[in-house]
Regions:
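Substrate-binding cleft and catalytic face of glycoside hydrolase catalytic domains
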Residues: 1-56, 214-295
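Noncatalytic carbohydrate-binding groove/subsite architecture in carbohydrate-active enzymes
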Residues: 2-3, 22-132, 137-138, 155, ...
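Hydrophobic faces of well-ordered beta-strands that scaffold small-molecule active sites
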Residues: 3-7, 48-51, 74-78, 108-111, ...
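Cell-envelope and extracellular/periplasmic
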Residues: 10, 20, 80-81, 113-114, ...
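Residue-level marker for beta-strand->alpha-helix junctions and adjacent short loops that shape enzyme
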Residues: 12, 55, 83, 115-116, ...
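Aromatic-rich peripheral "rim/lid" segments of glycoside hydrolase catalytic domains that contact
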Residues: 23, 120-126, 137-139, 143-216, ...
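Residues that form or flank phosphate/diphosphate-binding pockets in enzymes
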Residues: 59, 208, 238
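A generic structural signal for ordered secondary structure
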Residues: 110, 131, 141, 218, ...
């Protein structure tokens, strides 16, 4: 069951939205408002959430409020990875939530929180437990990022290698399961907090790991799952067949479905982070996906 629609992913991060083109996020704001209206036209009861921000910046939320975006939404979301990428300590999580609560009355979801096992699995094990202690009861949705390590043969793209929130080598070690599917120490730690903690797991186009992921999600008792449908993937041959397969596999979970990423051919710049040439096309994608999977 789709329980919420999320509009974009990390819109204040250059790895996901090219704000060198859209310097004040005016294009993004107009696109997000159109997307929210399109989703509501297909399912007026479906909550709409602003894509999780990284870094956690109250100024960005205020910008979205001033541009009328938040008036169209039911929640905002944040992402935090303080043991890997952020410029603050893990113990500052409550302060970071308070910073956002100071500029909006909307509920604040934590749509990605994670710790890598790059340095040591014990660090990730600690990170799961400490994150749960700090966050449970402070947010209506908490999605741990992620279940699966990224295969090292896949790219983890970044626009600024050392910038806060960027994806670099640690990104390959964020899972509770290793690339070969074997569990890490943190898996047992996570199981103590499921189903209060959900999972964020992205699936690549025709991802061979889908069935393995569903098996482990069920074994862990996960109820709340965040994933995405990429507008860029939607332009591929057989896209709907893949989307249908993915969504059928996830029917047993309460899914927050993220709509994001521009087909390179439809961007101002030929890249999935680019603002679209025609923002209405993204809204149309959101409407089609809502109609197909969440109406």
């Amino acid at each position: 069951m789709v329980e919420a629609a999320m509009i974009w992913n990390e819109p204040n991060n250059l790895s996901h939205w090219d704000f060198e083109i859209d310097e004040d996020w005016s294009i993004f704001a107009e696109m997000a408002k159109l997307a929210a209206a399109a989703i509501a036209s297909e399912n007026p009861k479906l909550p709409k959430v602003l894509g999780g921000i990284s870094p956690i910046d109250p100024g960005f939320i205020s910008n979205m409020a001033s541009k009328g975006v938040l008036a169209r939404l039911e929640a905002v979301a944040v992402h935090g990875f303080p043991l890997d990428w952020n410029h603050w300590q893990i113990h500052a999580w409550p302060d970071k939530i308070r910073e956002i609560a100071a500029v909006t009355t909307l509920p604040i979801w934590i749509s990605e929180v994670g710790v890598s096992s790059f340095g040591a699995e014990e660090v990730q094990e600690f990170g799961v437990a400490r994150s749960a202690e700090l966050l449970l009861g402070r947010s209506p949705r908490i999605h741990w990022y992620s279940l699966l390590d990224l295969p090292r043969a896949w790219p983890a793209t970044t626009r600024h290698r050392e910038a806060e929130g960027s994806a670099y080598y640690r990104h390959f070690y964020m899972g509770l399961l290793r690339e070969d599917g074997s569990p890490k120490r943190a898996l047992k730690a996570f199981s103590r907090y499921s189903p209060q903690l959900g999972i964020c797991q992205w699936f690549h186009f025709e991802d061979p790991r889908l069935d393995l992921a569903v098996k482990w999600l069920k074994e862990l008792g996960v109820k709340k799952l965040r994933t995405g449908l990429s507008w860029a993937d939607g332009e591929r041959p057989n896209a709907l067949e893949w989307f249908d397969r993915q969504m059928r596999a996830l029917e047993g979970f309460d899914v927050t479905l993220t709509f994001c990423f521009t087909p390179p051919s439809r961007g101002v710049r030929e890249h999935h982070t680019s603002p679209p040439l025609v923002i209405e096309e993204f809204a149309e994608f959101c409407a089609r996906m809502t109609r197909r999977y969440a109406s």
